[in-house]
Amino acid sequence: MYDIVGTNNSILIANVLVLIIICLLVVIVGCALLLILQFVFGVCGFVFKFVCKPTILVYNKFRNESLLNEREELLCDNV
C-alpha cells in the first residue's frame, strides 16, 4: 500500500515541529527573563526608595547647612 506521508514530507514536518518547539522555548525563556528583570528592578526601586533616598536627603541637608555656615563665616570675617 501507499504511504500517505512520504519520507521527505515526514522529515519536513518533523523539522517544522522542532522549529515551533524551539520558538516556543525562546518565547518562554524570554518571558521568564523579563519577569526576573522586572523583579530585580522592583527590588532596586524599593531599596532606593526606603534606604538610599533618605540617606541622600540627610546628606543634602547637612551639606546645605555646612554651606550656610561657611557663608556666614565668610560674611562675618568680611565685616
From Swiss-Prot:
InterPro entries from the UniProt entry: E_protein_bCoV, E_protein_CoV
Family: Belongs to the betacoronaviruses E protein family.
Keyword presence, Membrane: yes
Protein name (record): Envelope small membrane protein
Primary localisation category: host cell
Protein function: Plays a central role in virus morphogenesis and assembly. Acts as a viroporin and self-assembles in host membranes forming pentameric protein-lipid pores that allow ion transport. Also plays a role in the induction of apoptosis.
Signal peptide feature range: none
Intravirion-side segments: 38-75
Domain of life: Viruses
GO cellular component assignments: host cell Golgi membrane; membrane
A single BP term in Gene Ontology: disruption of cellular anatomical structure in another organism
Protein topology in the membrane: Single-pass type III membrane protein
Topological region Virion surface: 1-16
Compartment(s) of residence: Host Golgi apparatus membrane
TM region positions: 17-37
Record carries keyword Transmembrane helix: yes
Assembly information from the UniProt record: Homopentamer. Interacts with membrane protein M in the budding compartment of the host cell, which is located between endoplasmic reticulum and the Golgi complex. Interacts with Nucleoprotein.
Keyword terms, alphabetized: Apoptosis, Host Golgi apparatus, Host membrane, Membrane, Transmembrane, Transmembrane helix
UniProt source species: Bat coronavirus HKU9 (BtCoV)
